[in-house]
């Protein structure tokens, strides 16, 4: 398999059970993260990852069939971190004022994370061009929307659950689109876009 072929949705080939194997996978991902931060995922080569990680190319292929699998695994890790952040941020919401504060803080934190994480920016920028990453992105958006919808219903129990679920999914999707646009712009302009998004989203959240 060439280094430019994709695995059509595969991430890590096998989940390591032994500590030594787990440490090897962590080292591979750490090296890949560093290389993407340096030159972008387009320049990532399996042979270079293996060399910098200090393993043979055969050992690398035991865990990852191609570079797309490495990128997908990194995307999964970032999505998990983002979902944990959302769950923690919305967990205590029980009123409209708490929802407004929690949502505002989450968006600010999310934007700051994108500004400080070049690898996350790189992966997100390529999401729409990669079917597997696009599917993963939709799965992540649905999971995050469920958390947001639950918080919206706690804040305002009289809401219609189905309408709330649709609204939450749109808010999450538009938030992701806003982040993608904002990180391509000068920071001051990007910040204004994020602030505009917050105002628009809060109108729907608190309606």
Predicted segments, located by residue:
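Generic hydrophobic, amphipathic alpha-helix propensity
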Residues: 21-32, 49, 74-85
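Hydrophobic alpha-helical connector segments
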Residues: 73, 87-115, 171
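Amphipathic alpha-helical segments used for helix-helix packing
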Residues: 113-132, 149, 177-183
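Helix-turn-helix
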Residues: 27, 35-69
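N-terminal intrinsically disordered/low-complexity leader segments
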Residues: 1-23, 184
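Hydrophobic alpha-helical bundle segments that form small-molecule/ligand-binding pockets
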Residues: 93-96, 118-122, 131, 141-168
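Hydrophobic/aromatic residues within well-ordered alpha-helical segments
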Residues: 24, 74, 78, 82, ...
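Hydrophobic/aromatic-rich alpha-helical bundle segments in the mid-to-C-terminal region
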Residues: 134, 154-200
């Amino acid at each position: 398999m060439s280094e430019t072929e994709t695995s059509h949705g595969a991430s890590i080939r096998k989940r390591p059970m032994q500590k030594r194997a787990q440490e090897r996978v962590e080292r591979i991902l750490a090296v890949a993260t560093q290389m993407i931060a340096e030159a972008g995922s387009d320049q990532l080569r399996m042979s270079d990852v293996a060399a910098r990680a200090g393993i043979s190319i055969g050992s690398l292929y035991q865990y990852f069939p191609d570079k797309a699998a490495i990128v997908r695994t990194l995307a999964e890790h970032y999505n998990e971190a983002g979902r944990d952040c959302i769950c923690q941020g919305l967990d205590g919401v029980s009123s409209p004022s708490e929802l407004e504060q929690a949502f505002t803080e989450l968006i600010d934190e999310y934007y700051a994370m994108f500004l400080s994480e070049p690898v996350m920016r790189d992966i997100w920028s390529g999401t729409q061009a990669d079917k597997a990453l696009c599917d993963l992105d939709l799965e992540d958006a649905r999971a995050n929307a469920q958390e947001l919808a639950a918080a919206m219903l706690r804040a305002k129990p009289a809401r219609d659950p189905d309408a709330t679920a649709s609204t939450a999914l749109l808010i999450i999707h538009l938030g992701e689109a806003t982040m993608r646009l904002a990180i391509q712009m000068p920071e001051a302009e990007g910040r204004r876009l994020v602030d505009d998004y917050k105002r628009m989203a809060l109108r729907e959240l608190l309606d």
